[in-house]
Design a protein with these regions (language model features):
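Interfaces and regulatory segments of ATP-dependent nucleotide/adenylate/phosphodiester-chemistry enzymes
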Residues: 143-354, 471-518
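Proline-rich intrinsically disordered, low-complexity coils
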Residues: 10, 24-26, 90, 95, ...
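Long amphipathic alpha-helical coiled-coil/heptad-repeat bundle
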Residues: 2-237
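Catalytic core segments in nucleotide and nucleic-acid processing enzymes
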Residues: 319-518
C-alpha cells in the first residue's frame, strides 16, 4: 500500500550563507524596494509552480535579465565550487540535491510581503532582481534551520535516533504540503467534514453548528460543504501554468462567501499574527476586487472542509454563555468526536473481516467501570493481539516553527509518550505479559502483541517519528523484562484507515499483513 512507502529525498536549500559572505539586510529591506502587487503574484507563481523552478539554473535563466549576466555567473561559480566540495566530502554518505525554490519558500515570501507597510519601488530592474534573489536565500536560511543535538554510536557515527530526530525537524509542519497530493487530502477532508457535521446534529454541538451556519450565511451544512468544494476546485484545476484566479460574474454570485474567507491585497499582517501562516489558513483568499480572488494555496482552501472548522467552532463556543458553552471544548472534541466517533468507527471497519474479540474503550469501561486507563481499542484474534491507542493532539505552533528538537521532543514526550500513548501501551503489554489483563480472561499462552498508535493529525506523521516513538517503547519494555513477543510500534494516520476503508471492509487488505510488511 502506497501510504506506507515514503521516498525521502535529501534536498538541501540554497541559503544566503552559501552564496554571500557579507552581512545581509533584513528580508523586509530587500522586498520593500519592489512592487507589492508584482511580488504577490510572483509568490503565488512559486507556490503553484510544482517545483518547475526548483533548481538554481532554472531560476537564474527565468528570473534574471541579460544585464545581470555577471552577477548570475558569479553566483553559479560560487555554488559550483560548493557542490564540488560537498561531493568530495567523505562524511556526506548520501548524495545531496540543492534547490532554491519550494512551496514553503513561496508561502514564507508571501508572509514577508504582507508584513511590510510601505513599498518604494524606485530601484532599477537589475538591482530589484538581485534584491529578490537575496531575500529568497534569506528565507531559505530561516525555513531550513534546525537544531538537533548530535548523537554518536561507539564507532563515532551518527546514531539512527539522531537521523530520525533530524527528519522530524525537517519534515514536521511541512510534510502534508510537500508530500501528499491535494486531491488526496481533499477527499479525506470531505469525508471527515461530513462525519463531523453528522456528529454535530446529535451532540452538544447543535447550537454551535447553528451559529456556524449563520456566521457563514448558509441554511445547511450540506450547502456549506458544497460551496467549499466549489472553492477548492479553483486551485485544484489550475491549468494555466501560473496560479489560479477566481473571477466572479457580473452578478457577483458567491461573493459573500468568498469575501468572508479573504483579505484585501492592501492589508498589512504582522508576522506575529501569521506565525505558521495562521492568518492565511483562516483567510486563504486574497481579494483583488469584488470580482477577483487569488487562492493562496490549495491546502489552505481544502482545510476549510474540516481542519479549520475546529477553530471557528472554538471561537463560537467561547462566545456562548455558560448555559450552552462546553467546558473543556478541546477535550470534548478529541474524546467525543475524534476518539469515540471517528476512531471507533474506522477501527471497527478496519477489523470488520477479522474474528475474535473487539472492544472499544467504552466497551472496556462498561466491563469494569471502576478501572482506569483502559485501552482505546483492543482486538485479539487467536494468538494475535492488537493494542490501539488514539491521539488527537496539537503541537504548539511556535515549537513547530522553531524546528528545535529539544522543544519538539519535549512536546512529543508530553503528548505521545509520558503517561499517554507509548506509556499506556507499555502498561497494557505488561498486564498481558503478567496475565492480569482484566479485559480478556482467555489470553493465549503465547500471545503476539502488535502495539499501534493512531494519530488524527497527519501533519505529525512525518519520517522519523515512528522510529523515535518505537525507541521509547522498546526502552520501556527492556526495563520491564517482558517475555511476550512484541512487534515494533507502528504509527498509523487515521487518514490511512479512512482512505482504505473499503479495502479493509471487503478483506482485500489485512492490517496484520500490512504491519508485518511495514
Amino acid at each position: 500500500i502506497d501510504v506506507f512507502i515514503m521516498k525521502i529525498e535529501p534536498n538541501i536549500y540554497i541559503t544566503y550563507e552559501m552564496v554571500f559572505s557579507d552581512e545581509p539586510l533584513p528580508i523586509s529591506d530587500y522586498l520593500k524596494e519592489l512592487d507589492k502587487n508584482w511580488l504577490i503574484r510572483f509568490a503565488l507563481f512559486i507556490i503553484y509552480s510544482g517545483g518547475k523552478f526548483k533548481t538554481l539554473n532554472n531560476y537564474v535563466t527565468t528570473f534574471f535579465c541579460k544585464q545581470n549576466h555577471d552577477f548570475v555567473k558569479s553566483v553559479l561559480d560560487i555554488m559550483n565550487n560548493h557542490y564540488a566540495k560537498t561531493l568530495n566530502d567523505p562524511t556526506n554518505i548520501i548524495p545531496r540535491t540543492y534547490f532554491i525554490l519550494s512551496e514553503s519558500t513561496g508561502l514564507e515570501l508571501l508572509k514577508q510581503i504582507f508584513s511590510i507597510s510601505n513599498f518604494t519601488n524606485v530601484l532599477p530592474q537589475t538591482t530589484q532582481e538581485q534584491y529578490l534573489f537575496k531575500a529568497i536565500l534569506l528565507i531559505n536560511s530561516n525555513i531550513s534551520e534546525t537544531n538537533v543535538l548530535e548523537e554518536f554510536d561507539d564507532n563515532k557515527n551518527f546514531t539512527n535516533l539522531y537521523y530520525a530526530k533530524s527528519l522530524v525537524c525537517n519534515f514536521i509542519n511541512n510534510h502534508e504540503r510537500l508530500n501528499l497530493k491535494s486531491e488526496f487530502i481533499s477527499v479525506l477532508q470531505i469525508i471527515k467534514g461530513y462525519y463531523f457535521f453528522k456528529f454535530c446534529e446529535k451532540s452538544k454541538l447543535q447550537p454551535h453548528l447553528t451559529q456556524f451556519l449563520k456566521n457563514n450565511g448558509f441554511q445547511s451544512w450540506t450547502q456549506y460543504l458544497y460551496n467549499v468544494i466549489q472553492l477548492i476546485l479553483y486551485p485544484l484545476k489550475n491549468e494555466n501554468d501560473k496560479f489560479p484566479v477566481i473571477k466572479l460574474n457580473e452578478r457577483l454570485e458567491g461573493y459573500n462567501y468568498l469575501h468572508a474567507h479573504s483579505f484585501s491585497a492592501d492589508y498589512v499582517i504582522p508576522t506575529s499574527e501569521n506565525c505558521d501562516y495562521t492568518f492565511f489558513k483562516t483567510y486563504p483568499l486574497i481579494e483583488i476586487d469584488k470580482q477577483t480572488f487569488l487562492p493562496i494555496n490549495a491546502i489552505f482552501c481544502i482545510n476549510h472542509l474540516y481542519r479549520s472548522i475546529y477553530f471557528e467552532f472554538n471561537k463560537i463556543n467561547a462566545s456562548f454563555d455558560n448555559s450552552v458553552k462546553i467546558k473543556g471544548f478541546s477535550t470534548y472534541i478529541t474524546t467525543e468526536f475524534s476518539e469515540k466517533y471517528l476512531f471507533y468507527k474506522f477501527v471497527k471497519n478496519t477489523l470488520y473481516k477479522q474474528r475474535g474479540i473487539k472492544l472499544t474503550g467504552d466497551d472496556c469501561k462498561k466491563l469494569f467501570p471502576k478501572k482506569d486507563k483502559e485501552p482505546d481499542f483492543y482486538h485479539r484474534d487467536g494468538n494475535n493481539i492488537f493494542l490501539f491507542e488514539n491521539k488527537d493532539i496539537k503541537i504548539n505552533k511556535d515549537v513547530l516553527n522553531g524546528k528545535d528538537y529539544n522543544k519538539i521532543g519535549d512536546e512529543l514526550n508530553k503528548k505521545l509518550v509520558r503517561k499517554v500513548g507509548v506509556d499506556q501501551l507499555v502498561e497494557h503489554i505488561k498486564a498481558i505479559d503478567a496475565r492480569n489483563f482484566i479485559w480478556d480472561k482467555k489470553l493465549p499462552k503465547h500471545p503476539r502483541i502488535y502495539p499501534i498508535l493512531v494519530l488524527d493529525d497527519s501533519l505529525l506523521c512525518v519520517p522519523g517519528l515512528n522510529y523515535i516513538l518505537n525507541d521509547a517503547l522498546q526502552s520501556q519494555l527492556k526495563k520491564c523484562d517482558v517475555k511476550t513477543k512484541i512487534y515494533p510500534l507502528v504509527v498509523i494516520e487515521l487518514d490511512t484507515l479512512i482512505s482504505y476503508a473499503t479495502y479493509f471492509k471487503t478483506g482485500k487488505i489485512h492490517l496484520k499483513k500490512l504491519i508485518e510488511d511495514y
